[in-house]
Amino acid sequence: MLVPQLVVRAAVPADLEQVTAIYAHYVTTSVATFEEVPPTAADWRRRLDDLAGRNLPFLVAESGPVVGGYAYAAPWRPKPAYRHTVEDTVYVSPARTGRGIGSALLAALLPGCERAGARQVIAVIADTGSDASIALHRRFGFAQAGRLSAVGCKHGRWIDTILMQRQLGPSQ
């Protein structure tokens, strides 16, 4: 049987039900995200529209009709001087991890960030159960820039975050 090829493309509203399901898994079962209530498809539509309005990339990786993962870049902080710094988000369907989907998404996301005018990309990664995310970011040139201790409390335990950073474009 032929397996459909993986395609990374811009997210569209029709993808958001699958994006919602992927993220809901991580919200409810892990500390990969500090959200505690899964956003609805309507919430995701607002995020998609907001990022599109800022010319920031929101991508999905699909194989046939199945969205296997998604990635997007959002503003790092709201203050104007941070306008050239974004935070990346990459999630892969739990049924499709270990297949290169995260790598395909991040490989497409970084040039999209650069086209949007970003100079720095920050990854904020929970230090518990996130070895794959840390390894993914290292493979793409991110370096650890810091650690914040006990900044989140989810599922009854305190969680540290690791900050990873990658510069885009020419050096300063």
Residue ranges and their predicted role:
Residues Q5, H84-V86, F140, A150-Q172:
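C-terminal "cap" of GNAT-fold acetyltransferases
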Residues P38-A95, L106-A107, G112, Q167-G169:
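Acetyl-CoA-dependent GNAT
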Residues C113-A126:
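Conserved GNAT acetyl-CoA-binding A-motif
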Residues G98-C113, D131-R139:
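Conserved acetyl-CoA-binding loop-helix of GNAT-fold acetyltransferases
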Residues V7-V19:
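A short beta-loop-alpha structural element at the N-terminal edge
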Residues T20-L48:
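Conserved GNAT-fold acetyl-CoA-binding loop/helix
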Residues Y72-P75, V124-I125, R138, A143-D160:
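Conserved catalytic-core motifs of GNAT/GCN5-like acyltransferases
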